[in-house]
Amino acid sequence: MGRVRTKTVKKAARVIIEKYYTRLGNDFHTNKRVCEEIAIIPSKKLRNKIAGYVTHLMKRIQRGPVRGISIKLQEEERERRDNYVPEVSALDQEIIEVDPDTKEMLKLLDFGSLSNLQVTQPTVGMNFKTPRGAV
């Protein structure tokens, strides 16, 4: 099993990544040198722990957003995703197939006047009332 990282190591690594993201990478040794240059870390052992956690977080950041770390690049990416407008609206299709429940919801939202709605019966999925041993 691995070791538990202290609050000091985690906070220091997060701050270093937020401020110096462009200088860091997936290599422990380069991250160790960057940590040594930018921060006053009292001991070699603590510096290595922080650099190791920085490397771990950098690998996680490459896979996707990491909770507790906001990086300008990720913020811009999220803004772009939130402001996305499709070229063709889903309502501009010739026929929109909906089930009766969806039709009712659209009526409640004042979209009942859409002329291209076609109500279809939903396909029956899994039957959950069968006993466990039966096939």
Swiss-Prot record:
Domain of life: Eukaryota
Keyword Lipoprotein tagged: no
GO MF annotations, alphabetized: structural constituent of ribosome
Subcellular location: Cytoplasm; Nucleus, Nucleolus
Residues with Phosphothreonine modification: T130
Function summary: Component of the small ribosomal subunit. The ribosome is a large ribonucleoprotein complex responsible for the synthesis of proteins in the cell. Part of the small subunit (SSU) processome, first precursor of the small eukaryotic ribosomal subunit. During the assembly of the SSU processome in the nucleolus, many ribosome biogenesis factors, an RNA chaperone and ribosomal proteins associate with the nascent pre-rRNA and work in concert to generate RNA folding, modifications, rearrangements and cleavage as well as targeted degradation of pre-ribosomal RNA by the RNA exosome.
Protein name from the UniProt record: Small ribosomal subunit protein eS17
Biological source species: Oryctolagus cuniculus (Rabbit)
